[in-house]
Structures are given as C-alpha cells and as structure tokens.
Amino acid sequence: MAAKDVQFGNEVRQKMVNGVNILANAVRVTLGPKGRNVVLDRAFGGPHITKDGVSVAKEIELKDKFENMGAQMVKEVASKTNDVAGDGTTTATVLAQSIVAEGMKYVTAGMNPTDLKRGIDKAVAALVDELKNIAKPCDTSKEIAQVGSISANSDEQVGAIIAEAMEKVGKEGVITVEDGKSLENELDVVEGMQFDRGYLSPYFINDAEKQIAGLDNPFVLLFDKKISNIRDLLPVLEQVAKASRPLLIIAEDVEGEALATLVVNNIRGILKTVAVKAPGFGDRRKAMLQDIAILTGGVVISEEVGLSLEKATLDDLGQAKRIEIGKENTTIIDGFGDAAQIEARVAEIRQQIETATSDYGKEKLQERVAKLAGGVAVIKVGAATEVEMKEKKDRVEDALHATRAAVEEGVVAGGGVALLRARAALENLHTGNADQEAGVQIVLRAVESPLRQIVAKAGGEPSVVVNKVLEGKGNYGYKAGSGEYGDMIEMGVLDPAKVTRSALQHAASIAGLMLTTDCMIAEIPERKPAMPDMGGMGGMGGMM
C-alpha cells in the first residue's frame, strides 16, 4: 500500500479552496447572456468550444492532490445539478464558490463549522420553499420558447424550434438532438409510433417514389416467435382476405416458405401483406410487442398465454388507420387501441421509470412512453463547421433540458432575480445560536453571486445593479443582454424553478461539507527509478 500524505487545519483547507476557485473561475466565465466561451483541447480531432458549465468542469484535473480534491467536489455540484435538472450547472458552481469563500472567513475566525453548516441548511430549506411559492406554471409555447432562448445563450431560434417540437409531440414526447446536414436548424416530427425495424423483403414496397410499403386501414398480427411454415398462417390469411383489407405481420422473424408465399401473394395482388421483425430483444421485445398491441387494440399471440397462430381470429388482430413501412423503420399512425388502456399502460411504464436504476434503462422506458403518448421529434442542428456544430448542439441540449424542467416545476424570474427575491423568507428565520445565524448570513450573501457574475460579464458594476434590483419588488430585475431594468418575466427572461432550486441545493450541500472538513489525506506518488541505459546491443556495433 502506498504511503499517504495527511494534512490538517487551515493550511489544507486553503489548498482545497484554491482548487475550488480554479475550477469555479473557469466555469463562471460562461454565465449570462454575455458570458464567454471556453475552448477545450481534445486528444483526437479539433478543439471543442463550449458555453456549457458541466462540460468545462468535467475537463479539469489539477496537479496538486489537495487542490484537486476541492475541484472534484465542486465538479460534483455541476454534475449532480446537470443530472437532476439538465441545466444550471454554472449557477450551481458560482453559488458553491461563494458559500465556500464566505464560510471559510467564519471558520478561520473560530466559529463552529458544524453550526455554520446547520445554519446554511436551514436557510437553503427556507429559500427552496419560497422558490416553489413564487414559481408560476409554464404552459404556453411563448413561455417555453423564452426559457429555451435564455438557456441557449439568448438564441431565439433555438427557443422557437423547441417550443414547436413540444407543441407537436406533447410535453411527454421524445425530442432528440442530432447533427444536421445543412446550415439551418431543422425539425423532423414522426407522428404516431415508430420503431426501428423495416420490411423483410423489398418486394413488399408499393410506393416506388418514397420506397415504402404503405398500408391503409390494415390489420396487425403480433406473434412472439418465428414464422417459417405457411400452414400456421393460412387460417388468419383467409379471414383477412375475406375482409379485403391489408395485413402487417410483426413477429420475431418471418422466413423460408412463409416469407416466400407472402411475397408471391403480394406481387399477384391476392393479399396485400408486409412482414417486419419485432423491435428490441429479449424481455424488451415482449414489452414493446405488448405496447403495439395496446396501441392497435389487438393481442400478442403467444403460447405463454395459451394462444396459437392457427386458432387466431380477426378479433385478436390490432388495427390502425395507416401504417408506413420503410427499409429501416415502421410507423403506426392512429392505432385503434382504447384510450383508457393506453393511459394505464403509460402510467405503468412511468412507475418502472421511477424504479429503474440505469440511465440506459430509463431512456428506453421514456422512449416507450413517448411512442405511446405522443410522438418523436428530431431537432437537426445546422452549422458551417464541425466545431460550431458541437457548440450549438451543447446549447440546444441545455435549452431542451431547461424547457422540460420549466414544464415540470414552473418558472421564476431569471437573471439571478428569483434568488434575491426568495431572501425574504430568511427575514423571520429563527436559528439556535450566533454561529447558525452566521450560516444564514453566508447564504444571504451567496445568493447575490449569480447576478453579480452576470453583470460583471456584461461590463456593468455589480454592487450598483444588485442594490438597484433589491430596491425593486417582484420580478423587477436587470436584463444584461440589453442593459435595461424592468419586469424580467415581461422581458422574457425566465429560469426554470427546478434548475434554480437544484443549483442552490447541490451547491449548499457540497459547500457545507467542505466547511466541516479539517483533515485531508492523499496518496504520495511513488518515484519509480529510471530505466537503465540500454547500451550497445549485440551485433549492432554500439549504437548508443
């Protein structure tokens, strides 16, 4: 086991604070409408330019072990805020730096760090309650667009495209961000349920121009095993042929004689059918087949529930208004499923999301909810160069997270104003002793720090602006983008309440732990001896 370097007291705390300041100063330059970019070196490819706080924080590793511990703890603030709210990482870092800086003054003066932390925790709890009280719902497309614009560095086009996407697929719909092919941002919306499986044979295509197989008013047969024998399918095919309607077969696979017969029938015009593989694998495949069954009003024909293919009837089949099958995707539009059953299925999947442990599992469950509840929208980010594309994608993703948070918990006045107004909750806060009261004072001063940083980056005088904003009431604040004062919500400067709340809670949590630290332990790196000189190698004539 390697030897350890153990350090105590003010000296090591100062090193930790140095680490906090190095990371926070790198992150804070990105805050506000006039915040600057940070350029990140990459081992492969060109540099990455970003205004995303958490991306900057994740890049920072310091040489000094004790300074690095301080930096990593603040990095945790940014990461946690990003995980919970998806935005507000720079605000969280600025708040953490301020609480640590103010708190260290009191610790150095001899106050009890544990009581200081208790005071900080009480103040933050009161502020969070007040933020919830002053938050207003974010319902309209205009408000959603404003939240998106602010988060995307005052880019109104980004806000507008996110608002349009939410309007089209609903607030539960899946919105993804991808690289575009042009210079402009584009929005692609897939109505209905789409899954990533296409036709099993190109002979099923009936729209040569679009290269798709389109089925109007079709039946949908769902089977959880392979189909290779046409005899198993004949009873169902005969019933569908009598009804004079097309048929989509979704099964684990359709192969051999069964696939050949379906193709021949399709070409001859006897029965319009298309076969596709079921989406997903294993248990996820079963779950997705069940989703499709509920959406189309059919059942999954499975031996597990005592149903067989030979005995299937038209009542077991799902139905839809239209289904389009491409080479790689199938889209079901207007399934005939019962609305109450679809809602119940969505509620069931939402419960699974709450108990899911992996991010991948959660993401897949959320996709299933979206496909049942609304649809899927793809925002294609356009840019002239790859470096600009990455930077724009970062901003669009931040804006998307911010708008989701706004819809969830409402919005408050932006530009650091909400935190200043929430200070009113601390006026009547009773603490146990003078040290806890000092903890409350630390938070009172810290909540000014986001506004101070925004003003400083805009070239203003922070103290003058903070005092003028404090003289006002309600949503009165300073719009740094234009340098004017007024009602922040009317001027379209909104922050999601969830983002502001998460930033404050995570900043106070880590900062409080730092203040109560009195000892730090780091590994002493072993000095390995240099490799011996190779000298002249045999037969090489002494090349050294």
UniProtKB/Swiss-Prot annotation:
Protein family per UniProt: Belongs to the chaperonin (HSP60) family.
Gene3D superfamilies: GroEL, GroEL-like equatorial domain, TCP-1-like chaperonin intermediate domain
GO biological process, one term: protein refolding
EC numbers for this chain: 5.6.1.7
Substrates-to-products reaction catalysed: ATP + H2O + a folded polypeptide = ADP + phosphate + an unfolded polypeptide
InterPro entries, alphabetized: Chaperonin_Cpn60_CS (IPR018370), Cpn60/GroEL (IPR001844), Cpn60/GroEL/TCP-1 (IPR002423), GroEL-like_apical_dom_sf (IPR027409), GROEL-like_equatorial_sf (IPR027413), TCP-1-like_intermed_sf (IPR027410)
Binding residue positions for ATP: T30, L31, G32, P33, K51, D87, G88, T89, T90, T91, G415, D495
Protein name as catalogued: Chaperonin GroEL
Broad class of enzyme this protein falls into: isomerase
PROSITE patterns hit by this protein: CHAPERONINS_CPN60
Entry function: Together with its co-chaperonin GroES, plays an essential role in assisting protein folding. The GroEL-GroES system forms a nano-cage that allows encapsulation of the non-native substrate proteins and provides a physical environment optimized to promote and accelerate protein folding.
Lineage of origin: Bacteria, Pseudomonadati, Pseudomonadota, Betaproteobacteria, Neisseriales
Subunit structure: Forms a cylinder of 14 subunits composed of two heptameric rings stacked back-to-back. Interacts with the co-chaperonin GroES.
Pfam families associated with the record: Cpn60_TCP1
GO molecular function, one term: unfolded protein binding
Subcellular location: Cytoplasm
Species, as recorded: Neisseria flavescens
Gene Ontology cellular component list: cytoplasm
Keywords assigned by UniProt, alphabetized: ATP-binding, Chaperone, Cytoplasm, Isomerase, Nucleotide-binding
